Regions:
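Hydrophobic residues within well-ordered alpha-helices
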Residues: 1, 48, 66, 91-97, ...
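Short beta-strand-centered segments that line the small-molecule binding cleft or hinge
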Residues: 1-31, 68, 94, 116-120
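Secondary-structure junction motif
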Residues: 9, 52-73, 141-150, 155-166
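Short secondary-structure boundary segments
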Residues: 10-11, 33, 103-106, 131
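Flexible hinge/capping segments at coil-to-helix
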Residues: 14-27, 31-53, 145
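A late-sequence structural motif
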Residues: 33, 39, 117-161
Length: 190
């Protein structure tokens, strides 16, 4: 029952843990397919100022990160609704309950796609979260874990919000990505 390392969203407030930054993960705005913003491909952060966002319940780091984005944008939390997981948030958006922020890796294949949700990227400096690998500073495995963390560092293209959605805001299909890769090309970005 011992944990040697973990991959977590920063900030992590524990001086006994070594943190090795892996990547910056952009957020996307997820809206129901018939929402007034659904036709948009991009928006600026301040355009969220009149929106109420669905958030996770207390205790999730993603909730804290989304609240920070809400504060920066002048948006609010949608009262009366709190999700227990990312999948619940996705289902709430698909059911037209509201809009939310989703991390890019939570919507990229192989995650199941939903035709009821449109994904909108942010123009300019997109809101994001920092992901790090952490382990005990006193760990005898520190040299190995440092090398392992280097393997977890993701290429920027993988985290590109453009590649998370097709041109119409619908999540990119796994087929399009695989077809491009099989021809030795990077998947097309829009």
């Amino acid at each position: 029952g011992r944990l040697d390392a973990g991959v977590l969203a920063q900030p992590i407030h524990d001086d006994q843990l070594h943190q090795q930054f892996l990547f910056e993960e952009p957020f996307l705005l997820a809206v129901p397919e018939h929402h007034p913003l659904a036709a948009r491909k991009q928006l600026k952060l301040d355009e969220l100022s009149d929106q109420s966002l669905l958030l996770l319940e207390e205790g999730h780091c993603l909730r804290d990160q989304a609240l920070e984005v809400c504060q920066l944008a002048g948006a609010a939390e949608k009262s009366g609704f709190r999700a227990t997981s990312l999948e619940t948030l996705r289902q709430m958006v698909a059911a037209n309950v509201g809009v939310t922020l989703l991390p890019t890796l939570a919507v990229k294949p192989p995650v199941a796609q939903s035709s009821d949700i449109r994904l909108i990227e942010f123009r300019g400096h997109a809101p994001s979260r920092r992901i790090a690998m952490v382990w005990r500073r006193s760990s005898a495995m520190a040299p190995f874990l440092k090398r392992l963390a280097e393997l977890f560092t993701l290429p920027r293209e993988l985290l590109d919000a453009h590649s998370a959605c097709a041109g119409d805001g619908v999540p990119a299909s796994r087929g399009r990505m695989r077809a491009a890769e099989s021809k030795g090309r990077k998947p097309a970005s829009r």
